[in-house]
Regions:
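Gly/Thr-rich phosphate-binding beta-strand-loop-beta motif of the actin/hexokinase/Hsp70
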Residues: 56-73
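Short beta-strand-loop/turn "lid" adjacent to the catalytic site in phosphate-handling enzymes
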Residues: 10-43, 70-79
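Glycine-rich phosphate-binding loop plus the immediately following alpha-helix
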Residues: 74-115
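Glycine-rich beta-strand-to-loop/alpha-helix junction loops that act as flexible
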Residues: 23-26, 168-178
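Adenine-nucleotide phosphate-binding core of ATP-dependent small-molecule kinases
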Residues: 127-160
């Protein structure tokens, strides 16, 4: 909770002035109920990255239900996935279920892959259509796990970047990018 976080910050840092804000898809109602300011997620992350990592050129964020790429230079430009959760945390969770694991298990499996298979990344329904025959044919789970992460990376590059190069210092944000296998595929 916020109070626990503030106490922990106080215990570690002592007296300091804080200005907590709430962001995210469900944040506006929560901010109103708690009487805490709300800030748009893309503004919050862009300001934080600009302050902490001024050398950053691109931000790639994979959330639970959406994905964004923000080009910071030469002028800010943000792109977000459309109406489908393809290439997001929800997509990863859905695909992990098909392999009888969770996102962390998918990550562990992917580290041992040998072969990559093409899997649709735009939509979970299409990806499942690609994945199920591979499962039925006995494809190795590590190969399928890495193929799922490759589909996520492909969706980010093809769908969000849409031909614009991703170069320079890239900052990865979001829970799905916690998984090393996915981060390495993006690099």
């Amino acid at each position: 909770t916020l109070s626990e976080l503030l106490k922990k910050a106080y215990d570690q840092l002592g007296e300091l002035q804080l200005h907590p804000m709430i962001t995210g898809s469900g944040g506006l109602a929560l901010a109103d109920n708690l009487h805490v300011p709300f800030i748009q997620e893309v503004i919050a992350e862009t300001e934080a990255i600009d302050k902490e990592y001024p050398q950053a050129d691109v931000i790639i964020e994979l959330g639970g239900e959406d994905a964004k790429i923000t080009y910071l230079k030469p002028t800010p430009e943000q792109r977000m996935n459309g109406s489908c959760a393809g290439g997001t945390g929800a997509f990863i969770d859905q695909m992990a279920t098909l392999l009888d694991t969770d996102a962390a298990g998918l990550n562990e499996m992917a580290a041992q892959y040998e072969t990559l298979y093409p899997i649709a990344s735009r939509c979970g329904v299409f990806a499942k259509t690609d994945l199920q025959p591979l499962i039925n044919d006995g494809a190795a789970k590590p190969d399928l796990a890495a193929s799922i992460f490759t589909a996520v990376a492909t969706q980010t590059i093809a769908g969000l970047a849409s031909g614009r190069p991703i170069h320079g210092t890239v900052i990865f944000l979001g829970g799905p990018l916690f998984f090393m296998s996915l981060s390495l595929i993006h690099i």
